Structures are given as structure tokens and as C-alpha cells.
From Swiss-Prot:
It catalyses: 5-dehydro-4-deoxy-D-glucuronate = 3-deoxy-D-glycero-2,5-hexodiulosonate. Pathway: Glycan metabolism; pectin degradation; 2-dehydro-3-deoxy-D-gluconate from pectin: step 4/5. GO terms for molecular function: 4-deoxy-L-threo-5-hexosulose-uronate ketol-isomerase activity; zinc ion binding. Binds 1 zinc ion per subunit. This is 4-deoxy-L-threo-5-hexosulose-uronate ketol-isomerase. The gene is kduI. Belongs to the KduI family. Its EC number is 5.3.1.17. Keywords: Isomerase, Metal-binding, Zinc. The lineage of its organism: Bacteria, Bacillati, Bacillota, Clostridia, Lachnospirales. InterPro entries: KduI, KduI/IolB_isomerase, KduI_N, RmlC-like_jellyroll, RmlC_Cupin_sf. It is an enzyme of class 5 (isomerase). Zn(2+) binds at H198, H200, E205, H247. Its cofactor is Zn(2+).
Length: 280
């Protein structure tokens, strides 16, 4: 597990491209038959991924957590962005197709991942945050289980930002201690997300971009509103966004992204909007 320290806005505005990428960008999230785990000291979120191909994978706590098992003091949300597969939680198997999700509450001891077909392996992306209480484990099929009020059609064709935001893990849909996750999908011809942009001092966020053709890129915007920076990203990469940073993107092709948040306020609308004229 890689551990990354927090970052403050005064320092970050002096970072060069390499430093920005080293501190905030997460690549190679789906190693074959292994895990990629990044522990960010920003709100103690863990960003991870795995791709079981020839064997079943078991998630271990490792020395970094100083815990008997991974979810001893944590909760997590898992999404599948590959072929069909399964997650087994303390002996209960949850079968995933593409874009299915799962919330696992604190205290679950054994978490295993496997693919249905090794030639089309599942790709499991997940976020994990500290927890103080056990909530029920919940499987989420986006076509069947997400309530209408948690499916938001946003943007417009004229604004090149028409998109559907599905809130998978959020109070009222799935109860958690602090973790919130969902998927936003841009329609063909739309390339902007979250513009006008915002920050939220009470939460940090991680974006995971996917469904981007190999020859295309996403330009992720970050930094304070008056000190913006960018990171060039490609499909199946994630980026850490501190609470003081904007988090927005444009791209050379439509795309989707999984958003995950950690912090003290689960009110999704608790955002500090930034007027376009104030951006620099």
C-alpha cells in the first residue's frame, strides 16, 4: 500500500507537472492478479483497484492500517468497470456485471474478488473510508436499485456538458458513516463536467475517469479557484482532490467518472460554488 501525505494550497501552487502527478494522480489501478492501493492522509481515504484473472484475490489490511483485517475500522464502496465477476463478503457472494456497485459496512472480515471469465476479467475499483458504526452491506444494480431522485440529468447540449449523475452510495439511497460514491456519464458530444465548478471544505473527493478511447485524454482541473492547475489523464486513472481544490474536467471525447467523497458532511449539495468570472 502506497501512503501519500496531505497537501496545502500554498505549497501546491508551486508544484511542477511531475510533482502534481506524483502527489495526486493514481495510475495502473488494475494489475493482473494483484491489488493497487493508495492510502491518502487527506481524510484517510484509500483508493484501490484489482483485476483477478487466474485466481481469486483476498483483500488484506497490510501493515499500514495496523488492523486485524481491512474493514476493522472502515467501510468501502466497490464498482466493477470490467467483465463479469464476484465479490465474496464473509461467505456471501455478490455477482457483478459492468457498473454494478456494492457498499460494505465496517466489521466485514473476509473480502474476496474473482472474475467469471479470465479472458474478460472483472476490474474492481473501490474507495474506503474510516467508519465508527456498522451499516448493512448493500448491492446496487444501477438499472434497478437507484431511486429516481438519485438520478440527476444535468447540463445541456449547448454547454457541451449534458450528463447523468447516478448516486449509488449516499444517505437516503445507501446509509454509510461518511463514504459517498456514484457515477456520472457524459452524453456523446459533451466533454465538460462540473463547470461552473465548486469546492467543499467539509469533504475531499476522488475522481476515477473511464470509458475514454485509448487515443483520447481528459484534462482534469484542480487547485484553488484563483490558482488553477491541470493534470493530463487517461482512461482508468484516478485523481485526489483536496477539500480546498476545484475538481472539473474537459476531454477530447465523452467519458464517465466515478466520484467518491469522504468528510464530515454527507449533504451532497454542501458545495461552495465558484463564479466563472473569478476563475484564473
Amino acid at each position: 500500500m502506497e501512503v501519500r501525505q496531505g497537501a496545502n494550497a500554498r505549497d501546491v501552487k508551486g508544484y511542477d507537472t511531475e510533482r502534481l502527478r506524483n502527489d495526486f494522480l493514481i495510475q495502473n489501478l488494475f494489475p493482473a492478479d494483484d491489488f493497487k492501493l493508495v492510502y491518502s492522509q487527506i481524510d484517510r481515504i484509500i483508493v484501490g483497484g484489482c483485476m483477478p484473472v487466474n485466481k481469486e484475490l483476498t483483500l488484506e489490511a497490510g501493515s499500514e492500517l495496523k488492523a486485524a483485517y481491512f474493514l476493522e475500522r472502515r467501510e468501502m464502496g466497490i464498482f466493477n468497470v470490467g467483465g463479469n465477476g464476484s465479490v465474496i463478503v464473509d461467505g456471501t457472494e455478490y455477482k457483478f456485471k459492468y457498473r454494478d456497485g456494492l457498499y460494505i459496512g465496517m466489521g466485514s472480515k473476509e473480502i474476496k474478488f474473482k472474475s467469471e471469465d479470465s479472458s474478460k476479467p472483472a476490474k474492481f475499483y473501490f474507495n474506503s473510508t474510516p467508519a465508527h458504526k456498522t451499516y448493512p452491506t448493500v448491492f446496487i444494480d444501477p438499472e434497478k436499485d437507484i431511486k429516481d431522485e438519485f438520478k440527476l440529468q444535468l447540463g445541456s447540449v449547448e454547454g457541451c456538458n449534458k450528463r447523468l449523475n447516478r448516486k449509488y452510495i449516499l444517505p437516503g439511497q445507501v446509509e454509510t458513516c461518511q463514504l459517498e460514491m456514484g457515477i456520472t456519464t457524459l452524453e456523446p458530444g459533451s466533454v465538460w463536467n462540473t463547470m461552473p465548478c465548486h469546492t467543499h471544505d467539509r469533504r475531499m473527493e476522488v475522481y476515477f475517469y473511464f470509458e475514454i478511447p485509448e487515443e483520447d485524454i481528459v484534462v482534469h482541473y484542480m487547485g484553488e479557484p484563483t490558482e488553477t492547475r491541470h493534470i493530463i489523464m487517461r482512461s482508468e486513472e484516478a485523481v485526489i482532490s483536496p477539500s480546498w481544490s476545484i475538481h472539473s474536467a474537459s476531454a477530447t471525447h465523452a467519458y464517465a467518472f466515478i466520484w467518491g467523497m469522504a468528510g464530515e458532511n454527507q449533504d451532497f449539495d454542501d458545495m461552495d460554488w465558484v463564479d466563472m468570472k473569478d476563475l484564473k
